[in-house]
């Protein structure tokens, strides 16, 4: 009996020890697990920029514990640093430095699932005081975000260098109000590029951006643009381009559908090839337009330029030809399959449409420069 009790007691003791050990292991595992779950603290060390800390805290810290768990980090697909947010944040500051207007990108590289980046660091004003210090620091940290498809940057004051080829999946790029663009490299997957008031002394080479479909620029200046033989580029729109761009050469673009150039007084020459539509307005530096080899051309709108000569003898496919308010005195319409012709405001005397059998609309008014009382007689020859 005593032996039996001893055995039972021993077994009971073993069970207690095992249970105790498991409990201890569970406690240690729980502590370890909690330690592993501890996220990235939202502090100056991890996010040096005061504004970035505020943004991360308000937008991404869902449980307001001043740290980011991996789930919170993975949930971020867009980084948006916006001027409206800047104004809101500025109102709560009492210091006089306003360093938030200089955005330090350090820390943002942890958001690996980001697909869209929008950063605006434009000049802002607070209490009637213009804040002159603004710009981006450590932009290269964002290259670690390899899922980015769309990038928008506005207001960079510092000497800007963007190696956009380091974003392997980048498809859309927009740069605004960048006064000192020092270097710009594009990736092969980019489909759309837009510049608004961007200035650089460099030549912009788009010839190797093989996926590019659209290029748009307003108030843009550089030392020339190289388009090359980009087969997917279909639309080019440029307005108010600067004095560094003297020539636009799109003659090697085989699939270009539309070229639009407006308000560009410094532009001297345009070379075009396989194109369907061309639209020039207020480009007074251009003196001649050669569309003689543009056998795909359907629509030409050229208004208020310095053009006095148009070469088009081998372009029978044009349906609409508008050459209003230029300096054209003569035009050869031989073999032209034109339905609508406008020559308003040109110092032209004779218009021979005898070989342009399809013309059904002709718009001709007297030249803007005709003196009062001078009757300008325009003769239209149909046969």
Report residues per predicted region.
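N-terminal secretory signal peptides that target proteins for export/translocation
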Residues: 1-3
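Sec-dependent N-terminal signal peptides of Gram-positive bacterial secreted proteins and lipoproteins
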Residues: 5-25
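N-terminal capping/linker segments that flank leucine-rich repeat
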Residues: 22-157, 161-199, 203-210, 219-231, ...
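Conserved hydrophobic beta-strand positions in leucine-rich repeat
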Residues: 79, 117-119, 151-153, 173, ...
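Per-repeat beta-strand-to-loop junction in leucine-rich repeat
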Residues: 82, 120-122, 154, 176, ...
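Leucine-rich repeat
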Residues: 159, 181, 201, 223, ...
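Leucine-rich solenoid repeat scaffolds
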Residues: 342-383
């Amino acid at each position: 009996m005593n032996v039996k009790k001893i055995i039972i007691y021993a077994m009971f003791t073993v069970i207690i020890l095992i249970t105790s050990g498991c409990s201890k292991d569970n406690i240690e595992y729980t502590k370890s697990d909690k330690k592993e779950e501890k996220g990235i603290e939202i502090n100056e060390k991890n996010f040096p920029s005061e504004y970035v800390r505020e943004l991360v805290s308000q937008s991404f810290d869902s449980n307001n514990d001043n740290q980011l768990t991996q789930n919170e980090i993975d949930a971020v697909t867009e980084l948006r640093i916006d001027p409206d947010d800047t104004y809101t944040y500025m109102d709560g500051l009492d210091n006089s430095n306003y360093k938030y207007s200089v955005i330090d990108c350090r820390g943002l590289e942890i958001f690996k699932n980001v697909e869209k980046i929008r950063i605006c660091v434009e000049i802002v004003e607070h209490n009637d005081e213009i804040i002159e210090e603004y710009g981006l620091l450590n932009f290269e940290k964002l290259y670690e975000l390899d899922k980015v498809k769309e990038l928008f940057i506005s207001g960079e004051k510092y000497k800007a260098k963007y190696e956009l080829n380091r974003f392997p999946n980048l498809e859309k790029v927009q740069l605004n109000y960048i006064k000192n663009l020092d270097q710009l490299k594009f990736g092969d997957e980019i489909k759309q590029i837009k510049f608004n008031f961007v200035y650089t002394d460099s030549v912009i080479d788009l010839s190797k951006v093989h996926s590019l479909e659209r290029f748009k620029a307003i108030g843009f200046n550089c030392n020339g643009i190289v388009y090359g033989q980009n087969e997917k580029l279909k639309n080019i729109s440029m307005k108010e381009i600067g004095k560094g761009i003297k020539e636009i050469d799109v003659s090697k673009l085989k699939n270009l559908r539309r070229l639009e150039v407006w308000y560009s007084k410094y532009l001297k020459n345009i070379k075009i090839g396989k194109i369907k539509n061309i639209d020039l307005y207020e480009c007074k530096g251009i003196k001649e337009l050669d569309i003689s080899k543009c056998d795909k051309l359907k629509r030409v709108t050229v208004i208020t330029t310095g053009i006095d000569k148009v070469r088009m003898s081998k372009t029978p496919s044009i349906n609409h030809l508008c050459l209003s308010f230029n300096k054209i005195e003569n035009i050869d319409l031989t073999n032209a399959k034109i339905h609508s012709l406008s020559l308003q405001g040109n110092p032209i005397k004779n218009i021979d449409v005898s070989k342009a059998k399809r013309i059904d609309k002709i718009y001709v008014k007297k030249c803007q420069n005709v003196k009062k009382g001078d009757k300008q007689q325009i003769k239209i020859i149909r046969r």
